[in-house]
């Protein structure tokens, strides 16, 4: 029985019924739920942040026993989910200052990376 049940970049909001129901049933744990409640996000739209990318893990991985693989908090963080957000990935000026620096806006090349920041987790013993 593998401790990792699902790891996805499903391009779906954390609040979506699919993710919410899976986490609610107790088989899965959505480590980004607390981050969203605290105002963090991977994608900004209409001056509101949302968690658009998710890594969903099994409850076994989230609550692993001593000596087993277990979901870990990042050093210095109170969250189990992490958002990779570096200065070079952030729009530095204009209306979308602080948003992810996009590759394209419409048909115009911006030279950025994506319209959302990537996510990652730590797994250890």
Regions found by a protein language model. Give the residues of each.
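Metal-dependent phosphoester-hydrolase catalytic domains
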Residues: 1-125
